[in-house]
Amino acid sequence: MKTLLLTTVVVTIVCLDLEYTLKCNKLVPLFYKTCPAGKNLCYKMFMVATPKVPVKRGCIDVCPKSSLLVKYVCCNTDRCN
């Protein structure tokens, strides 16, 4: 009986913790944040004229289109931006 109860508790905990949360870098890559539900991409935005210097980083749901002035790079693994 105790084994059944313990098994039920373990299965419940595992099932409740199945939702994966993505972690994305903030502007300074030493710091990151856990993305809220629905934000399943990390992004990095930078000006086309200065591609080595990111202007903004974070979590996003859909990768924006780049323009002539601004470029976006999106990815979907932890701290990939």
Swiss-Prot record:
GO biological process, one term: killing of cells of another organism
Compartments (UniProt record): Secreted; Target cell membrane
Keyword Heme: no
InterPro entries for the chain: Cytotoxin_Cobra, Snake_3FTx, Snake_toxin-like_sf, Snake_toxin_con_site, Toxin_cobra-type
Entry's Gene Ontology molecular function annotations: toxin activity
Keywords tagged on the record: Cardiotoxin, Cytolysis, Disulfide bond, Membrane, Secreted, Signal, Target cell membrane, Target membrane, Toxin
A Gene Ontology term for the protein's cellular component: extracellular region
Known tissue expression: Expressed by the venom gland.
Signal peptide: 1-21
Intrachain disulfide bonds: C24-C42, C35-C59, C63-C74, C75-C80
Function: Shows cytolytic activity on many different cells by forming pore in lipid membranes. In vivo, increases heart rate or kills the animal by cardiac arrest. In addition, it binds to heparin with high affinity, interacts with Kv channel-interacting protein 1 (KCNIP1) in a calcium-independent manner, and binds to integrin alpha-V/beta-3 (ITGAV/ITGB3) with moderate affinity.
Subunit structure, interactors included: Monomer in solution; Homodimer and oligomer in the presence of negatively charged lipids forming a pore with a size ranging between 20 and 30 Angstroms.
Family assignment from sequence similarity: Belongs to the three-finger toxin family. Short-chain subfamily. Type IA cytotoxin sub-subfamily.
Protein name: Cytotoxin
Organism for this UniProt entry: Naja sputatrix
